[in-house]
């Protein structure tokens, strides 16, 4: 469906619907928060019953998510030592390769067996489908790295990691998408970097994004789109089919593992709908995790856990941060939105609408590493974390546009619209309200209890009920602590066992961080959207220590 994926410069009915749907998330969140506070004061017994019911629901959701977090982490760790390039080359001779796999006995530990069985099943399905697929020698990786104010020590390690991978660097085109407004020093840094690495790749060059193009916001999506359009011209000139190009838009601090692009190529080749799919790895924030304060580690690890959980249910998965997709699909949907802040999630919703709901995100059991938020001082770090989470929460700007598109699009099944719309709406509401319900509002009925309620059996039963619930919830906390330590990069000798113990103890900060550095920024973003006070793009400061 042809749909103008924007909330700007609308008129008539579209403008009214846009404002209605912009108001809905923020208004709902405020009604829930204020309504529960008022109810706790006016009728504490009713409020207590609602809170206990919410606690039970939260516990079930928490245990459910913890189970899938464990399963997803197990699968991720099972693929940690996989030779993805060997598998990719095997697909080029699929009949012979499948025969070899069928004759190969199951060996190794449980993780190796699971990895092997999953791989053999995928190859069997691919062979049975018999569909045409490109040879691995025909696959090209297009990597777009937007640069605004990041210095060489931020983006060069990521470029070096591209060159060191097992996927042939001579099948990679790397573009540094440089903002025209960048400082002279950064422009010089990008030129020096291109001169150093250009010969390592099929090609590498700089695309300068002009400042002040009409209709564009000062956002990463506008920069990436300008670079992608130049890439399209370049690929046509080189006679490289868009269907065989995998495009990746990476944050400037992204560092990939040696097997990353080999694994991406594998997931692309075995995907039956590769031209209608995005590919989402698990982001971890390990580049500077040893130097990050506890509040940052808790929040960034929580973001990684969320992606791990979502990867177990691809129907709920939405692109986030650094991700990849077929370049043909990117061209078909007319690239990233140029007037939106949340370009990483917006490109999924734009594709979902364009292809009438026939678009999916394929989870990759592979990681890529980025910087955790670290500033010169602890307080500046806190402020930067707040701004970053508010920017992430600004993804709520997708909701009104998606809802308008659902009303116009008759080809997307009604049930899929309802399910998808509810998932999107509920995700933003739970982001803002759950933390308040768990840490602040839950105490109010006892504080405002009148004589009738305070002398009831239920009043004396509540502490035991909530105590049992939170004791059961501690299983999830312990699991998070263990897995967070497992996700840490290898100790380079500078950090003692005491620091690892400190990393475990940091999870005691969860009640504070989820309220003030997660729920409050999200509520801030929703309130701004509700009031029509639209955000501008804020580039996270990158500080190397």
Question: What positions do the PLM features span?
Answer:
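N-terminal membrane-anchoring/stem segments of glycan-assembly enzymes
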Residues: 1-131, 481, 507-513, 521-531
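Loop-to-transmembrane boundary segments
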Residues: 8-28, 122-155, 186, 217, ...
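Membrane-embedded multi-pass helical conduit in multi-pass membrane proteins
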Residues: 31-76, 423-531
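Internal catalytic domains of large membrane-associated glycosyltransferases
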Residues: 78-397
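Hydrophobic alpha-helical transmembrane segments and immediately flanking/interface helices
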Residues: 165-172, 453-459, 530-545
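Intrinsically disordered or highly flexible coil/loop and linker segments, enriched in small
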Residues: 168, 237, 273-274, 288-289, ...
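C-terminal catalytic/acceptor-binding lobe
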Residues: 352-432, 441-457, 514
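Membrane-proximal soluble regions of multi-pass membrane proteins
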Residues: 373, 379, 383-384, 388, ...
């Amino acid at each position: 469906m042809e749909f103008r994926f924007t909330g700007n410069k609308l008129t008539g009915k579209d403008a009214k619907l846009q404002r209605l749907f912009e108001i809905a998330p923020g208004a709902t969140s405020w009604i829930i928060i204020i309504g529960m506070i008022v109810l706790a004061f006016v009728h504490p017994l009713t409020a207590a019953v609602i809170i206990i019911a919410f606690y039970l629901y939260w516990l079930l959701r928490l245990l459910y998510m913890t189970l899938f977090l464990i399963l997803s982490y197990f699968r991720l760790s099972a693929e940690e030592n996989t030779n993805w390039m060997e598998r990719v080359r095997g697909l080029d001779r699929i009949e012979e390769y499948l025969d070899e796999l069928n004759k190969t006995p199951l060996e190794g530990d449980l993780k190796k067996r699971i990895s092997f069985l999953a791989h053999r099943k995928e190859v069997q399905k691919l062979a049975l489908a018999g569909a045409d697929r490109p040879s691995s020698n025909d696959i090209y990786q297009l990597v777009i790295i937007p640069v605004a104010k990041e210095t060489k020590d931020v983006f060069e390690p990521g470029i070096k990691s591209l060159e060191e991978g097992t996927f042939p660097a001579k099948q990679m085109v790397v573009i540094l998408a440089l903002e025209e407004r960048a400082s002279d020093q950064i422009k010089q840094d990008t030129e020096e970097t291109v001169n150093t690495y250009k010969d390592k790749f099929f090609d590498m060059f700089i695309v300068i994004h002009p400042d002040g193009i009409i209709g564009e916001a000062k956002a990463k999506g506008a920069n990436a789109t300008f670079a992608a359009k130049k890439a399209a011209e370049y690929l046509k000139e080189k006679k490289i089919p868009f269907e065989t190009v995998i495009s990746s838009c990476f944050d400037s601090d992204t560092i990939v593992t040696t097997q990353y692009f080999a694994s991406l190529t594998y997931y692309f080749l075995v995907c039956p709908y590769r031209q209608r799919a995005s590919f989402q790895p698990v982001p971890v924030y390990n580049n500077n995790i040893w130097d990050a304060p506890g509040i940052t580690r808790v929040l960034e690890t929580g973001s990684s856990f969320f992606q791990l959980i979502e990867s177990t249910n691809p129907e709920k998965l939405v692109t986030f941060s650094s991700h990849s997709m077929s370049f043909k699909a990117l061209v078909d949907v007319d690239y990233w939105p140029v007037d939106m802040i949340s370009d990483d999630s917006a490109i999924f919703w734009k594709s979902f609408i364009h292809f009438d709901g026939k678009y999916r995100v394929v989870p990759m059991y592979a990681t890529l590493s980025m910087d955790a938020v670290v500033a010169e001082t602890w307080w500046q770090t806190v402020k930067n974390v707040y701004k970053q989470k508010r920017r992430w929460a600004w993804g709520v700007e997708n909701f009104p546009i998606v809802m308008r598109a659902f009303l116009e699009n008759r080809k997307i099944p009604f049930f899929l619209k309802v399910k998808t719309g509810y998932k999107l709406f509920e995700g933003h509401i739970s982001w803002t309200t759950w933390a308040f319900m768990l840490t602040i509002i839950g105490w109010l009925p006892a504080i405002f209890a009148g004589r009738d309620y305070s002398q009831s059996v239920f009043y004396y039963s509540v502490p035991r009920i909530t105590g049992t619930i939170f004791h059961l919830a501690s299983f999830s906390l312990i699991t998070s602590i263990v897995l967070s330590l497992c996700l840490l990069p290898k100790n380079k000798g500078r950090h003692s066992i005491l620091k690892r113990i400190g990393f475990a103890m940091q999870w005691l900060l969860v009640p504070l961080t989820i309220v003030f550095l997660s729920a409050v920024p999200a509520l801030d973003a929703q309130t701004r959207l509700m009031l029509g006070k639209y955000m501008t793009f804020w580039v996270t400061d990158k500080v190397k220590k």
